[in-house]
Regions:
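Charged alpha-helical initiation segments
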Residues: 1-34, 175-179
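Terminal alpha-helical segments
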Residues: 1-17, 47, 51-55, 59, ...
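Terminal, compositionally biased low-complexity regions
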Residues: 3, 23, 52-55, 70-81, ...
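Amphipathic alpha-helices that form helix-helix packing interfaces
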Residues: 9, 16, 32, 39-43, ...
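Hydrophobic packing residues in well-ordered alpha-helices of helical domains and bundles
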Residues: 25, 29-33, 114-117, 139-143
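Short, hydrophobic, well-ordered secondary-structure elements
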Residues: 26-51
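Long amphipathic alpha-helical segments
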Residues: 53, 133-134, 155-179
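Flexible secondary-structure boundary motifs
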Residues: 55-127, 131, 149-163
Length: 179
């Protein structure tokens, strides 16, 4: 599913860049932002599901990645049969720390750019104003760097977890300047 979302994001970004109608352009950019962040979340869920079968991680790490509630009862770790959603940022940090050991959260530009996109997504999802005040150039900038950064991080994780990169058609979305 994450692949479809990445392609959808690129599709909407291209549509946004080709229209002269500001309202329509913002509509497409918002859709692209949602699709990009949904792609990241879907990818993390996919990785978590695969790792839950692989017995590579500790049970509490798998529970965390797969949004399972866990507890310590009587000094014993237990995975409960309940959902408990965990922050995307925390899941990414866990996976990156495990599978991309040389990744620097402070120095890798893709990390801050991805979370700049997430911040925009959160602003759209939980608006504090009546009107979308983000201008077209800002949408374009944040989405262009955010989509590219999402793909870069996902590709690095794919190489670390699966020992192979993302498909070329996805990698090409980050290098073409269609947006």
């Amino acid at each position: 599913m994450f692949e479809d979302y990445l392609e959808d994001s690129n599709y909407f970004a291209v549509k946004a860049s080709k229209t002269n109608n500001e309202r329509e352009s913002k509509r497409y950019y918002r859709a692209a932002v949602f699709c990009t962040m949904s792609a990241v979340e879907a990818f993390i869920n996919y990785v978590g599901d695969v790792l839950s079968q692989a017995e590579i991680l500790q049970s509490y790490e798998v529970a965390f990645l797969t949004d399972r509630k866990f507890d310590i009862s009587g000094g014993t770790f237990q995975i409960l049969d309940q959902m408990e959603y965990h922050k995307l940022e925390d899941k990414l940090k866990l996976l990156i720390s495990k599978f991309i050991p040389d990744f620097s959260f402070d120095k890798t530009p893709s990390w801050s750019r991805l979370f700049e996109l997430k911040k925009l997504r959160d602003t759209i999802t939980h608006p504090r104003q009546d009107v979308d005040e983000t201008d077209i150039a800002e949408y374009r900038r944040i989405l262009t760097t955010g989509l590219s950064s999402a793909i870069e991080i996902m590709d690095s994780l794919a190489k670390g977890v699966f020992k192979r990169p993302l498909r070329k058609k996805l990698l090409d979305l980050s290098v073409t300047d269609n947006v």
